[in-house]
A protein has these predicted regions:
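Conserved phosphate-binding catalytic cores of ATP/NTP-utilizing and phosphoryl-transfer enzymes
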Residues: 1, 111-134
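A short helix-loop
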Residues: 2, 9-10, 17-25, 29-31, ...
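N-terminal beta-alpha supersecondary unit
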Residues: 2-85, 92, 114, 118
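Phosphate-handling active-site elements
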Residues: 70-73, 104-111, 130-131, 180
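Short Gly/Thr/Asp-enriched flexible loops that form oxyanion-binding sites at enzyme active sites
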Residues: 81-105, 124
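Active-site nucleophile and cofactor-binding loops and adjacent substrate-binding regions
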Residues: 82, 93, 109-116, 136-138, ...
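Short, acidic/small-residue loops that bind anionic groups at enzyme active sites
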Residues: 98-119, 158, 162
Length: 187
C-alpha cells in the first residue's frame, strides 16, 4: 500500500500527516503546530511571521509525524503538499520542503488545492458523503458555496466579496476584547 506524507502550510498552522492505503486510506499519524501565539498580539495573521514560523516548524512536524507513524523517509511513496490558495510565503515553505523530500527520496509530488482538500477531508469523517452535494467551505480567508457534482468537478455558487467568515469572527472578537483567534470565543 502506498504511503503518503501530507504537508499543509497555507496560513498559520504547520501540519504533517502520514497516510497509507488506496481507496479507504488510513491515517497513521497527524500533527499540527499552531503559531497563534505569534499572531495574537497583532489580532490576526501576519504573513511574514507565519512564514518564519513554518520555517522553524516544518522539519520537526514532519519528522515527528513519520516517527509516530513508524515510517521512515525511504518508505514515503508520495508527498502531497498544499499548493494554494494561501499566503505566498507560507506556501513556499511547504512546497519547497515537499519538493526537497520528493526529489531526495524519488517520491511522487502532488500539489493539493487547499479548498479541495477541505472537501475531501469531509469524506474521512463522513464516508457516506458522496457527490453530488452542496458544500459551504469556511476556512480562514475563504467562504465559498460549492456545488460538488463529482470529485474533481465543482461549480462555485457563491463567495464573499470582501471579508470571509473567519476574518469577520476575528474582527468582531477584537472589537469585543475577546482573544485571538475569535471563532471559538464567539461561538
Amino acid at each position: 500500500m502506498p504511503v503518503i506524507l501530507g504537508l499543509e502550510t497555507s496560513c498559520d498552522e504547520t501540519s504533517a500527516s502520514v497516510l497509507s492505503g488506496s481507496g479507504d486510506a488510513v491515517t497513521l499519524d497527524s500533527l499540527v503546530i499552531l503559531s497563534q501565539d505569534v499572531h495574537r498580539v497583532f489580532g490576526g495573521v501576519v504573513p511574514e511571521l507565519a512564514s518564519r514560523a513554518h520555517l522553524t516548524s516544518i522539519v520537526p512536524v514532519a519528522e515527528r509525524a513519520m516517527a509516530d507513524a513508524s515510517i521512515s523517509l525511504g518508505e514515503i511513496d508520495c508527498v502531497a503538499v498544499t499548493s494554494g490558495p494561501g499566503l505566498v510565503g507560507a506556501l513556499l515553505v511547504g512546497v519547497s520542503f515537499g519538493k526537497a523530500i520528493a526529489h531526495g527520496t524519488g517520491s511522487a509530488l502532488v500539489g493539493v488545492h487547499h479548498m479541495e482538500g477541505h472537501l475531501f477531508a469531509t469524506s474521512l469523517e463522513h464516508p457516506d458523503a458522496v457527490p453530488p452535494f452542496t458544500a459551504l467551505l469556511v476556512s480562514g480567508g475563504h467562504t465559498l458555496l460549492i456545488d460538488v457534482e463529482q470529485w474533481g468537478s465543482y461549480r462555485m455558487l457563491g463567495a464573499t466579496r470582501d471579508d470571509a467568515a473567519g476574518e469577520a469572527f476575528d474582527k468582531v472578537a477584537k472589537l469585543l476584547g475577546l482573544p485571538y483567534p475569535g471563532g471559538r470565543p464567539i461561538e
